[in-house]
Amino acid sequence: MLEKKALAERFYVNFGKMSRIGKQPIQIPDGVEVKINNNLIFVKGSKGELTQELHPEIKAEIKDKEILITLKHNKSFNFAIWGTFRALIANMIIGVSKGFEKRLVFEGVGFRVSVSGNKLVLNLGFSHPVEIEAPKGIGFKVEKNTITVSGPDKNLVGQIAANIRASKKPEPYKGKGIRYEDEVVRRKAGKKAATGTTTTV
């Protein structure tokens, strides 16, 4: 009984939080153009342009350099959608005006990474190099052993960075591979070392 009560309380706290997020207007900064056409929202800025289809329960309108997100039907199960779409549109504004970046670090003897046109070319000790093509709006930059993925779409930047990491995941013994810049890799001791010893990088 107590467990059900706790779950119910958590349910209403989370929905209350999401509804508070949804109510907050989104500022439109200078240099950003926003258009709403039926259930589509278009956002354009110096870093690119994005389009998002709105959920059927979500209404968006522009008023005094702000985007207002409201629910068409004020039902509790719509509150999560409300907060989610408000956060999504806010990220679109940030993306086209400032952009998003994700950095990765590669470690390994003989590893080489370069940019060729719109492709990231990774020589990671395999028989052939790994090539990752940049989707529209995504840019690659390589400096020393750091790879930077940039673009206006936060989710796409994160997905491409994840694909790069997956091409050679960091192994736990010598740390060789590709990791996120802020990632902590749990290091394991080799067979000759003491069992259970771990370090971090």
Regions found by a protein language model. Give the residues of each.
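N-terminal amphipathic/basic-hydrophobic helices that include classical n-h-c signal peptides
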Residues: 1-17
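N-terminal intrinsically disordered, cationic/polar leader segments
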Residues: 17-162, 166-201
